[in-house]
Amino acid sequence: MSKFVAADEYIVPSFQWLLGPTSSQVESFDSSVAGWIKRYEDESKRPESTVDGSCESFVLAVKPVMIGGQCEPAYDQAKWAETCLNVTNLASGLTGVRLIPLPEMARMIYLDEEDSFVDESEVDDWYPEDTSDGFEYLSADGSDYHQNSEPEEEVLDKSNGTLESEEARHETDVKSICSFRDIPVETTMGHRYLALSEEFASIEVDYQVSSIVTPLNKGSIYMTLDVHEETHPKSGIQDKASIERLEAAGHNALKTHAYFDDSYYEGFEESADFSSDFQRLKIKQSHVDWYKDPDKFFEPVLNFGASSRRVGSQKTVLTALKKRNADVPELSDVVDATEVPICLRQSYLNIYGADCLFESFNIMAKGLDYHKRWKSHKELQGVTLLCETNLQRYQHMIKSDVKPTVTDTLHVERDVPATITFHGKGVTSCFSPFFTACFEKFSLALRESIYVPIGKISSLELKSKALNNKFFLEADLSKFDKSQGELHLEFQRLILINLGFPVPLTNWWCDFHRSILSRWTLRPGVSIPLLSKTNRGCFHLLWEHFSDNAMMAYCFDMSTAELAMFSGDDSLVICGSKPEFDPGVFQSLFNMEVKVMDPSLPYICSKFLLESEFGDVFSVPDPMREIQRLQKRKIPKDVQVLRADFDSFCDRMKFLDRLSELSLSVLCRLTALKYCKPGIEGDVRAWLSGFAYYRENFLRYSECYVTDGIHCYRRVDPMSRFKPIDKFQRSDKEWFHDWRNNEFPKKPIDKMARMFGAYKGPVNNDRVERKAKYKVNAAMHDPFALAYERRYVQELELKNDKGNCSVLRE
């Protein structure tokens, strides 16, 4: 029960009567207030008011009146009690200031009146000021001094009875005003503590220098500075990178990913029963051993990304096909297929884009030129003739490198690998050059506000494009391949014809894809019929852009977009006002699931878009994805493969040179918003510092993987010889990194080596020396050969000059 509310007036806590039915309670409050008002109608009977939070104190301080049976102003028990509490705390904190009475302060706060709490009725602007020069001024003639002045007796009579009160009042005012007008100065530890009494130790005994620690035996101090220290000081930003810090940041950001081992779930899946819902399915004996030797791949040191390497066994393939290629929903609405290509042309193509593929001869000639280029630097082995191949049969494949998840659902759900339905390279090489030529022609006809990152050097860097104060629409067609059907094949045919692609070639392409597609997977032994799939070489990318652009233009007004980016199944629309887009309409019309990110951020192709200080847009890879890519389990134990992965890592980390402190803060905030994790901004900074550290050289990058000393040169701890341990019983903890030592220990360093014999790894000093000498000789061979050739040419020129001179003499 509150100390500011009397026991007989306390009914229920404020938060209860505010939420519940309060009619009867309000009437009781009004009746109690009316009783107190009637009791103190006579001003002479009013006692001194207090601020104890009771109804009586409210009547005495606020002085309400009864109008029509209701109290004005209304009496709020909880608000009045809280007001009294605040006034009491305020008065206790301002001890050196003369304030107005507490009931008056409570009345002003309760009625929300603006006025000062300081009592200014008796405070004037007088402030004591010492203007003397150190001596008292007296006139040379005393009679002149008293000539124009009043008699001393009259002055004393005028000030009689008031002098003492004035002096007391001024003394009080000076103390109160001086407490406010002290000039703030910097304080030290000497200002904070004042020693009151102390007693030093005796110095009769000769102390050693090392033993004199605290000569003050007894003392008491008094704290004079009334300042509360911060109990939890904020730590500065640390940029030092280490494996331990990166792993700690990863465990904080991804709660369910810590030390996740997928091998248990792999064995559980292979040993459990499997139920299939396919209508038509062919299965034969599988030739895949689901348990592969993991020692053939590098083991990452970090373990929070849940990056698993899947084996394409029969049950894994069936699980992936069931998740990715089955259970396609039916259409729930009707759409005019002929309007879709018209929207594509009107929304994305410029005035010169009408019939951009109409000149079919030029398209075919360009495609033939692409084919000749491919043939000039590729062998023709494996290239087949289309007339001798059944194009209705495809191959199925699953991605063994599973894309790691970023949601906290790893403890309840296991990722399913993605599937790919494709033609072989020999088949796609026959028609991909023609569709490449179509894509080139189509990209040249796009409007300036439409951007499609294509080509060998595909970049998301844009000049003079602003992102600040913009609205974003981030849409992802995550189930693009799964949701395709007859309708999308008709979209494809109409779009190609509308753009001017040859009609006979278009009809031929679409007709044989309407048939059932079936193909045995080579090793798992699974065959399943599929309908209208588009994972077929270059045209898959072309059709993804066509369909994504056309369906977005049909459901969204692209005229409101200042900039639109499309890359496969990812799309990003930048608008000056808030975009209006209904995913339900999109799904009901096109039988395709579209996922609109909330909140929508400048994010496309797993990259964030940031605006530089000069008004340009540059892309930054997702830090969450990049830290998970440092834990890949599909890198074979080969130096060249690991170095190639390091080169790819350095190429992706080029954005670090462009990050300012402002861009770094924005990137951390965008990452936290993207994954709805407000507490990972510090973790993102730790990851970025790790990226900058490990991209410096290959030896640092090798720390992220267990390389068994192949790339991390080590030497013995020099203090180990003082320890009573046999040199043949050293453990891994007694070795530390030393990049200047180029010799790996030849003695066994762990338990397994002592059990199975001496360490015999891929590192052999003799072989390394021979290989190094061979590289040096090979590097020196070319310069020597060029030097000898140049000397031979000079000798020939000299002989030729001598012959010419002899001819001239004759």
Curated annotation (Swiss-Prot):
Q: Where is this region: Disordered?
A: 140-160
Keywords, comma-separated and alphabetical: Nucleotidyltransferase, RNA-directed RNA polymerase, Transferase
Q: InterPro entries recorded for this chain?
A: BBMV_Gp1_N, DNA/RNA_pol_sf, RNA-dep_RNA_pol_alsuvir
Which residue pairs form cystines in this protein? none
Q: Name one GO biological process term.
A: DNA-templated transcription
**Catalysed reaction, written as an equation:** RNA(n) + a ribonucleoside 5'-triphosphate = RNA(n+1) + diphosphate
Keyword presence, Nucleotidyltransferase: yes
Q: Name one Pfam family in it.
A: BBMV_Gp1_N
Name of the featured protein: RNA-directed RNA polymerase 2a
Does the keyword Transferase belong to this entry? yes
User: What Enzyme Commission number does this protein have?
Assistant: 2.7.7.48
